[in-house]
Each structure stands twice: as C-alpha cells, then as structure tokens.
Amino acid sequence: MVFALVRMNTLDWIVLLVTMVGIAAYGAWHTRHPGHLDTYLKGDKTTKWGTIGISVMATQASAITFLSIPGQGFESGIGFVQNYFGLPLALIIVCAVFLPIYRKLGVYTAYEFLGQRFDSKTRLLGAGLFLLQRGLAAGVTIYAPAIILSTVLGWRLDLTIIGTGLLVIIYTVTGGSAAVSLTQKWQMGVIFGGMMTAFVILTLRLPQELGLDGAVHIAGAMGKLEAVDFSMNPDKRYTIWTGIFGGLFLSLSYFGTDQSQVQRYIGGAALREGRLGLMFNALLKIPMQFSILLLGALLFVFYQFQPAPVFYNRVEWQHFASGPAGATLQALESKHAALHTVEREKIRDWLAVRKDDDAAAESAARAAMLDARAATEAVRQEAKTALLAADPHAKTKDSDYVFIGFIMDQLPHGVIGLLIAVMIAASLGSKAGELNALGTTSTIDLWRHFRPLAAHDEVRNVRAARWFTALWGIVAIAFALFAGFSENLIEAINIIGSIFYGVVLGIFLVAFFLKRVGGTSVFWAAVAAQTLIFALYFLRHRFPALDFSYLWYNLIGCAACVGFSLILQAILPRQPVRAPRP
C-alpha cells in the first residue's frame, strides 16, 4: 500500500502565516529599540511570575518536545516521563539557593558569579562549557522541526533551516530578552491549544466500539503504559533511579546554571516572581510531558486499527522504493500490511475475551496478540535493514515522523495549519531563548571581560549583544545544515546536555557550599571531570561496561568535579578565596 502525502491547502497556509508572523511582529514591535543593556538582557526586571513561568517552559519545550516525545511514546511507551522525576526537587533547590544569590549579586549571567567567587579563568571555563553545549543544542533545536517539516511538506531542508533560523534571529536581535519572554507567552498559548485539539481529535478518531477506555487498556497490554521501572540494570536508559538521581542533577544544572534558563527568571520584578515562575514549572512539567507521551501511546493504538506504513518517514521510503531496492521494499510493505491485519484481529480477539472474565483465555489471547505485534515489528526492522542495505547513510529512525504523519493524514485543513504553527512556534520559542542566552554570555563573560573599557558604554554593549546573538544564530543554522542525528531528537538534546551539565553543576556547588576551595583547584577539577565524561561517552562502544544510561553522566560529572576540587585544594599551594560582592 502506498501512503500518499497530504499537502497543506490555502486555509492551512493562512492559519500558519497569520499565527507565526503575528507573534513575531508583536514581540518585535512591543520591545523594539531597548537603549540600555539591562533592558535588552533582563527586560528591565519587570517580568511577572506568569510570564516567567511560561517563558521557562517555552525555552525548554522546543519543537522536539512536540515532534519527538509523541514518537517516543509511540515507540517505547511512557517510561520516558521518569526522566523528569527529579525536576520538582531541582526547582525547589534553585529557588532556595541559586536564585537568591543571583538576585543579590545583580549579575547578568550565572558565570559572572563564578568570576566573583573564584577567578576569571573559572568564569571563562563555565561560560565556555555553556557556549559549547548550548551552541550545539541550538543547532539540534533548529534541525529538528526543519527536517520533519521539509520532509512532510515537501520543502527543501536547507531553505527550511535558513528560513526558520533567520526569523527567530530577527525578532530576538530586535527586542532582546523582553521580546523572547513576550513572544513565548503567545507561542505557548498556540502550543497548548494545538496539542489539546490534536488529543481531542485523536480520541474521536478511535474506533467507536473501543473508546478512550479501551484504547488505554490496549496500550497497557502492549507495554506502552509502564511509567515506572524499578530495575537496577544500569543499561536501561529510563528507570526511577536514573530519573530521581540522574534527572535531579540534569534539571538542577539546566535550571540553575544554564544561562538560557537563568536569564528567564533573574529578570523578574522581585525574588518572589522568579520563585513563583519556577514553581509553576515544578507543578506542570511532569503532567505536561506525561500527557504528550500518552498522546504517543494512544497514537500507537490508533494505528492498530488503521492502515499503517511499514516506515513512517514516507518521503525517505518512497525515495528508495523508486530505486533498485524497490522490489524488496514493496514486498516488505505487502508483508507488513498482511501481518498488521492479523495483529488487528488478535487485538479484537483479546478485547472480546476480556469481557468474559476468563483469566486463562485472556492470558492466551494476550500472548497471541503480543506474538502478532512482535511479528509486525520484526518486519519493520527488516525494512530498516533493507534501507541501510540500499544506502548505509539512510536515516532509519522514523519515530519522530509518527505525529506529524498523523497531523497530515487525519486532521482537517485549518487544524493542520494550526499544528504546523505549533511546531514552528515551539522551535522559535526555544531557539530565541537559547540565542538570547548565548548572546548575553558572549557579551558579558567574553567581550566585556576582554574589553573592560567598553563596559560603561551602553550603546556599544547593546550593539555587541545584538551582534553576538546574530552570530550564534548563524552558527546554529550552519550546524543544523551539516548535522545528522541517529538518536531520537529529544534524546539527542538530553545527551548533549548530560555530557556537560554535571561538570558545570559541580563548579557551582563548590562555589555555593565549599567556601575553602579556591579557583585554581575547581578549575583543574572541572577540566579533569569533563575529560572523564568525554572518555566515558566516546569509549562506551569499545568497553561495554561503560555503556550505561547517559543520565548518570550528570551525577558522575558533578561528583567528580566536587571530589577532585577537594583533593586538589588539599595538595595545591594555598589559594586566596573570594567572597562574592553585590
């Protein structure tokens, strides 16, 4: 069966363009021409807690969240939600420790605090690690929606990357931090409205005799609703232990030391506003991620009762199907369709037996259903192997295409345009927050550090911040143009963060709690800890014992940095210890 691509019509384009251009123009116009660096980088400290909370959420919730997480739920179930179990505690710690210090010192960036507490080289190291990892992540956040949208909508990938990148550069450079926060508020409104619409339509499109209750039971029987895994196996990426411990340190570093988030809440009108904004996220983040994963699990059930492609990246599939591998791929497609029909019948058999309250019959029907699912999935793996045989560089990770395929196939025109706007809005919101933070850090921690005489020239500072913001936007576009990712995109983002975040968090924990440790000790400790994490990551394929969940990198990097700092402080000559001053 050939699955044709549905294209957007005039109504979809009108909805998309009005939504996106309206949001960008609104933010740029209302925050144009900030004359002071404080206004450009912090929004003049007038932001209320609601805007802070939404801005913090929007900076984290990129298009990857709304493209990749439903695919994660579709493919692996809702267990990914464990990744966020440590987040509420992390935000409480940020509110109690990090935020008051940043507010008291009046810093523009988190790394200014490191310079005051330690020395300039430690400040530059912290800023450098942030710029490196966030610069890479910015490339992923622009690559993610571009590759999906270009594939589904027929746009050229390079032009899609450049177009979305330039749009976000324009309004971020024009208005600075205030523009980012203001536009993110409207973007999140579009996002929530669009996702709720998709959830409702998906529920209505389920078979009438099934309903939401039946769909949930099928998802559970298929292993898609296992939210908590107590396994002690270190090879498993997502367990309650990686979520509570690894996720705690990942979230603590991200919200406490990543300038893309710090900049969102230090611009609050008061300490209370920043705290309330963060608590808003502590309460809503897990339910939001759970809902998006559940949407993916329900998509899995939906496609059990609909004709489903053997490979969800349909443009990629059709490209190879029209080539020398066409006969093989068409045979696999027919085989998959036949097995998919068998699987559907086994599911209906299981549903019928469930009503009879016969445990033995239910168990047998369930086993038959799972065997049919395994057979269908085996053909999908055969298809991916065939694609790789045709081209070793073929992208076989197709879970990111499931939700966008559902949008294009199943939703009415107008709603399609709205949900495509959701994807782009999420991309722009996250990208704007990242670029704003990269420009701020480059200006404050690099340019003003090496050009101290320019620190008092407000016009020059704002101009430099704008140029750095635009420069990082161009770097991110360039990285996105030449990058390729084999991981699920939401995992790619978390892997990049986990490689760096633990060490950066370790530096800050030493600064906060180990008052006797000096700058030289923590500097070399951080270098050693980061080297250790690089070794663990790049040697994991050579040494299987090192191939454990990437979330543990956060805990290992942090513990190594703190431990090495204490050791070096004990053996190095005594160093002067600074006390930060407001």
Predicted regions: what they are:
Residues 1-582:
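Membrane-embedded helix-loop-helix hairpins and adjacent transmembrane boundary segments
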